[in-house]
């Protein structure tokens, strides 16, 4: 049990939003809040173009944000700031940006935010399409549940876990107390799947949610070595250096 993850093991938060989409704070504010947490790296992952309700980024705005992140990176030595996206997996299974756009980002998350009522087969087709894309590193809140509000889109968990393992796609424990998705039971049952614990912060205060995600992981006996945001600054840089996840 000595290797079970603790809050002190977390070296960065890699899913968060800014005023570019539906977040409350600028990139700079988020950077300073992450530095205040003592983090060594962070990824800015605003919503993608089809999620209009969340002010999703058209390609041109995404690339403009990318430039702003590069400038801020030169300014702040104490943290590495990476460009990313929380990209929608569309109802037909296609992804919200083309690969040539994804190639320009440091880190790509994919997520389902619409058409939750599809059949399990259709949902799995969407998730499979995302997992098999060479740029998609991780799937956010993999069941889509909101505690007390909606059950989510009911993927076939067994299939999703096999798929994640096969394609080396990371699955998220979303630390927002309304989500806690994946939950402790799932991460305990599938010990080989790589994880990341993130706050999905839409406000600087939300960075404090990390403790709920870590508590969920602890309940699921998750060891530190399964969670990619426990990597050191250097190792995380190496991990995402070539942008494309390694294909078996």
Where are these regions (language model features)?
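Charged catalytic cores and adjacent phosphate/nucleic-acid-binding surfaces used
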Residues: 1-18, 27-44, 49-79, 91-248
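Conserved SAM-binding loop
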Residues: 22
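Active-site catalytic microenvironments in core metabolic enzymes, especially phosphate/sugar-handling
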Residues: 84-87, 212
């Amino acid at each position: 049990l000595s290797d079970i993850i603790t809050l002190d093991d977390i070296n960065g938060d890699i899913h968060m939003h800014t005023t570019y989409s539906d977040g409350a704070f600028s990139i700079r504010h988020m950077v300073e809040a992450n530095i205040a947490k003592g983090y060594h790296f962070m990824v800015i992952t605003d919503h993608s173009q089809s999620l209009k309700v969340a002010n999703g980024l058209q390609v041109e705005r995404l690339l403009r944000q990318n430039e702003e992140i590069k400038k801020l990176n030169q300014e702040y030595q104490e943290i590495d700031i990476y460009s990313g996206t929380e990209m929608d997996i569309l109802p037909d299974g296609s992804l919200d940006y083309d690969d040539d756009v994804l190639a320009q980002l440091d880190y790509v998350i994919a997520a389902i935010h619409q058409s939750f009522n599809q059949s399990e087969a259709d949902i799995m087709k969407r998730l499979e399409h995302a997992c098999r894309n060479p740029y998609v590193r991780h799937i956010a809140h993999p069941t889509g549940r909101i505690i007390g509000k909606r059950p989510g889109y009911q993927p076939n968990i067994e299939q999703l876990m096999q798929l994640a393992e096969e394609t080396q796609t990371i699955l998220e424990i979303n630390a927002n107390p309304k989500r806690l998705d994946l939950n402790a039971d799932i991460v305990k049952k599938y010990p080989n799947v790589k994880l990341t614990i993130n706050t999905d912060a839409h406000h600087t205060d939300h960075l404090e949610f990390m403790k709920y995600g870590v508590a969920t992981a602890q309940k699921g006996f998750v060891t530190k070595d399964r969670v990619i945001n426990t990597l050191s600054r250097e190792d995380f840089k190496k991990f995402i250096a070539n942008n494309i996840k390694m294909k078996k």
